[in-house]
A protein has these predicted regions:
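Phosphate-binding glycine-rich loop
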Residues: 1-23
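Conserved coil-to-alpha-helix start sites within the AMP-binding
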Residues: 3-7, 30-35
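Short hydrophobic alpha-helical segments of the AMP-binding
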Residues: 14, 24, 34-38
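A short helix->loop->beta-strand "cap" motif at the edges of active sites that frequently abuts
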Residues: 22, 43, 101-105, 136-138
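Short beta->alpha connector loops at strand-helix junctions that form conserved
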Residues: 28, 47-51
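Aromatic/hydrophobic pocket-lining residues that form π-stacking "cages" and hydrophobic walls in ligand
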Residues: 34, 95, 125
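Active-site phosphate-binding strand-loop segment of PLP-dependent enzymes
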Residues: 50-121
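PLP-dependent aminotransferase class I/II
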Residues: 139-201
Length: 201
């Protein structure tokens, strides 16, 4: 179904609430499902506020090292919602290095990946990982949806890609809570995902 379900389910999959101080880091402003998913998974939240000097991009430097050490999940959104700020490769590198040091999962909300102002499309988490030689994709998980790409928010069609071990656990969790898509929605989704012309129009 749509990426909102997946963004929520990932937190339930990867958060270990028995760990003292389990934390989810989010950009601010943020899509409300990030905080809801964190709280229902039993984690606390920390927020990286937007920096007006950088087109309102999240300022990850506001998160101190002690908080990063407790972090189990980081939500990022590039292009940002509602700011439109895009994360450059250097910012991805810094977050990957933090993830490697502290072991947290990066949930990359890429629903707006095809709505941008510049000439070049923004880097997604997996593209950035590959560009940095991190082709095993350890800890990043990317989310996308047809609702923005194809202007079909009622269709509830999205996908998840990334770290294979995390996705194995994610799919097991989804077995118990997810709902199947109807054949009609599946067929329409395949057609929409397979067509670029309507996205560029």
């Amino acid at each position: 179904n749509g990426s909102r379900e997946a963004l929520f389910a990932l937190a339930q999959t990867v958060i270990d609430a028995s760990t003292a101080g389990a934390t989810v880091v989010c950009p601010n402003p943020f899509y409300q499902i990030y905080e809801g998913a964190a709280l229902l998974a039993g984690a606390g939240t920390a927020f990286a506020n937007s920096d007006a000097r950088r087109n309102f991009a999240a300022d990850w430097s506001q998160i101190d090292e002690a908080t990063w050490a407790r972090t189990q999940l980081l939500y990022v959104c590039s292009p940002g919602n509602p700011t439109g700020a895009v994360m450059p490769l250097a910012e991805w590198r810094a977050l990957f290095e933090l993830s490697e040091r502290h072991g947290f999962v990066i949930a990359s909300d890429e629903c707006y990946s095809e709505i941008y102002f510049g000439a070049e499309p923004p880097l997604g988490a997996l593209q950035a990982a590959r560009a940095l030689g991190r082709e095993r994709f350890e800890r990043p998980v990317a989310f996308s949806s047809l609702s923005k790409r194809s202007n079909v928010p009622g269709m509830r069609s999205g996908f998840v890609a990334g770290d294979a071990a995390i996705l194995k656990s994610f799919l097991l969790y989804r077995t118990y809570h997810g709902s199947a898509m109807s054949p009609v929605v599946q067929a329409a989704s395949i057609a929409a995902w397979g067509d670029e012309a309507h996205v560029q129009a």
